[in-house]
Amino acid sequence: MANNNNVFISYAWGGESERIVNELDADLQSKGILVIRDKRDLGFKGMIRDFMRQFGHGHAVIVVISDKYLKSPNCMFELVEIARNKDLYDRVFPIVLGDADIYDPVNRIKYIGSVLI
């Protein structure tokens, strides 16, 4: 599934994240860029963990960071798989939404706690 021309998008389903991802997906695909999203490309009864592990191997990864994303164990698993691969800073393009309260250190700790619980 992963090759040098794929762009993976990691996001929490629903709300503003989904709207933004739908727009990005349509725009990138109209330019001939293959976009991979779990909601569409995983398939019925697909192996979600195997699919998530592929995220880190894409040519580029767009991460739409929202409050919901930061509180989701599945999204955090995707982020860990992305981070396990080299050239992270050259291949990952974050989009931070307004509800993701990550700029205050105390609030970042709250996100860590919500995923670990």
Which residues are covered by each model-predicted region?
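Short alpha-helix boundary/capping motifs
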Residues: 56, 110-111
